[in-house]
């Protein structure tokens, strides 16, 4: 019990309460000097988190479940061909979480799906930078690839056999043409996240265009009126197509030299997670998505499609980092402990005033741009630190995952940017 003080007329500021759950009691006492409250409780208040309660254990023990609810929560309902080799298994669980045995036996009510491919499929390769100018044409192909991942060979999707898809650099105001060929076994489109464009080319199936069938082709005409960081991905069965690798970044350059404060270099990072087990990818639902509302969390965190990101910088270097969260449902909370960081831009472009921050919270589809200065030699981690939730016991717990390491050399960076960075 923590005493907060005497209640008087007017408003009393308590300050931050750093507790996961709390209840506030106001009691009527004979004197404000009492050490232990004994009077009648006249007011009771509680944090919203106190409403978090464990489920009815008896319900799960006997294996009772509700009927399957509607899965039509994605942009387009597409039934995929079930995979002969795919099977439902127990989903990997974090080491510090438990599920009841009856709950662990539950399986989705739809057939499992995984993409199928033979040995002739190309190997996925890292993304390439494509610099486009006004009037250029970009040709993209959505197809299947083989990908080496943590000692396994996975069949996944890719634009132009690249994972992530090609990184596009475009000058502000440019107009380009994109020809998309669908080499998948299912319909698809491309949505250009955040770009103000002609509605006909927004990529929303059955609203702004008809989805491209397998073997089909569609031509997008795009104009980029705003500088900033954007990304592209399908709007058909995102739970499958985006999760399997159909995404890429677009960096639209401003003609202004002072659009951002100075930095020594830029890094463009796409954040994702992937759900895998000992057999490879955990299957998706063939008839419908198997995860709704909270979505499908992965158990391996990725930066630019790979676990354990690594970057080599010099002491004193200022790095401009463009972050894009392409995961289905995970919100990231990123920081660089021991390095100074300020946020300079977001989804809609640069900020009028840069702000110092300890971390940045990035929800799915969001983008942020930060400047980080690495002052001292050594290793700086890039952790994701969140307050996670144990639904079984109704409790919060701390979770920390390291996405990568920045290795800072003792050699000093050319050009001291401390004056402009410190403003």
Where is each model-derived feature located?
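Short beta-strand segments of immunoglobulin-like
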Residues: 128-129, 164-169, 307-312
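Extended terminal and domain-junction accessory segments
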Residues: 69-139, 242-276, 352-423
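Exposed beta-strand face motif in extracellular beta-rich ectodomains
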Residues: 20-24, 176, 228-230, 319, ...
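Histidine- and aromatic-rich segments of cupredoxin/plastocyanin-like copper-binding domains
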Residues: 200-213, 286-422
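Histidine- and aromatic-enriched segments that form or immediately flank copper-ligand environments
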Residues: 137-252, 330-361, 380-397
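Exposed aromatic-hydrophobic patches
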Residues: 9-18, 219-222, 369-372
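Short, polar loop/linker segments at the starts of domains and inter-domain junctions
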Residues: 149-163, 279-297
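N-terminal targeting/export leaders
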Residues: 2-72
């Amino acid at each position: 019990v923590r005493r907060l003080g005497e209640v008087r007329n007017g408003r009393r500021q308590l300050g931050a309460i750093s507790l996961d759950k709390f209840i506030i009691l106001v009691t009527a006492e004979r004197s404000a000097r009492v050490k232990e409250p004994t009077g009648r409780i006249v007011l009771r208040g509680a944090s919203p988190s106190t409403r978090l309660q464990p489920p009815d254990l008896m319900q799960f023990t006997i294996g009772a479940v509700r009927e399957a609810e509607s899965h039509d929560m994605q942009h387009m309902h597409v039934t995929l061909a079930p995979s002969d080799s795919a099977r439902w298994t127990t989903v990997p669980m974090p080491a510090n979480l438990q599920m009841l045995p009856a709950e662990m036996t539950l399986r989705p009510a739809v057939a499992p799906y995984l993409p199928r491919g033979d040995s002739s499929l190309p190997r996925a390769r890292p993304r390439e930078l494509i610099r486009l100018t006004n009037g250029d044409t970009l040709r993209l192909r959505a197809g299947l690839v083989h990908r080496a991942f943590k000692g396994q060979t996975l069949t996944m999707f890719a634009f132009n056999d690249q994972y992530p898809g090609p990184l596009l650099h475009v000058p502000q105001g440019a107009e380009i043409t994109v020809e998309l060929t669908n080499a998948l076994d299912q319909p698809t489109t491309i949505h250009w996240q955040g770009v103000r464009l002609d509605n006909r080319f927004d990529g929303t199936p059955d609203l702004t265009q008809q989805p491209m069938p397998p073997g089909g082709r569609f031509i997008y005409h795009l104009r980029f009126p705003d500088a900033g960081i954007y990304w592209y991905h399908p709007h058909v069965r995102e739970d499958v197509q985006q999760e399997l690798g159909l995404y890429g970044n677009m960096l639209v350059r401003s003609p202004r030299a002072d659009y951002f404060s100075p930095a020594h270099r830029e890094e463009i990072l796409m954040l994702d997670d992937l759900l895998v087990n000992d057999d490879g990818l955990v299957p998706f639902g063939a008839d419908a998505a198997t995860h709704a509302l909270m979505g499908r969390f992965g158990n391996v965190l990725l930066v630019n499609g790979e676990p354990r990101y690594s970057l080599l910088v010099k002491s004193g270097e200022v790095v401009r980092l463009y972050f894009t969260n392409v995961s289905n449902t995970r919100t990231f909370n990123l920081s660089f402990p021991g390095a100074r960081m300020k946020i300079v831009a977001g989804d809609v472009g640069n900020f009028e005033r840069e702000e110092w921050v300890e971390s940045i919270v990035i929800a799915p589809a969001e983008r942020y741009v930060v400047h980080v200065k690495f002052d001292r030699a050594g290793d700086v981690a890039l952790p994701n630190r969140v307050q996670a939730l144990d639904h079984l016991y109704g409790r919060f717990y701390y979770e920390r995952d390291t996405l990568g390491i920045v290795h800072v050399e003792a050699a000093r960076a050319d050009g001291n940017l401390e004056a402009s960075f410190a403003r």
